[in-house]
Amino acid sequence: MEKVNLTEKFSQFSEHYSPKIAGELNGQMVKLVKFKGPFVWHHHDNEDELFYVVRGSFEMEFRDKTVTINEGEFIIVPRGVEHRPNAKEEVHVVLFEPGTTLNTGNVKNEMTIDNLGRV
């Protein structure tokens, strides 16, 4: 059992929308990701996602509304719900989701990351 220092882990990478695995528990992955700018519209057929903001804030856009998630807050996006993260400034986010979750969900494009790195 070892503790994880999020500040130190986030300092190990600079890419946006490229999740890194920081831990695993019960089939779930703890992923660290930096957002800046809009991501691709997508949904996940089989997985819910939890987005916890460590630093900064971002807007989670849905087709019918936009929700601002600030530092210290989280949002759970249920499976099947189309969404798109969008950050005006860089934001640091912790994701909790099944290990099989593809970052772009039902969409395959240049933002899709098939093999996640570890920090």
Role assignments for model-derived ranges:
Residues 63-79:
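Short acidic-glycine-tyrosine-enriched beta hairpin
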Residues 21, 50, 59, 66, ...:
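Short, surface-exposed charged micro-motifs
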Residues 34-35, 44-61:
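Short, conserved beta-strand element in jelly-roll/cupin
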Residues 6-41, 47, 105:
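A short glycine-rich, His/Asp/Glu-containing loop-to-beta-strand
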Residues 2-10, 23, 88-119:
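Double-stranded beta-helix
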Residues 26, 54-55, 70-71, 89:
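A cytosolic small-molecule/anion-sensing beta-strand core signal
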Residues 42, 60-61, 77, 82-88, ...:
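Short beta-strand His + acidic residue motifs that chelate non-heme Fe in jelly-roll/DSBH
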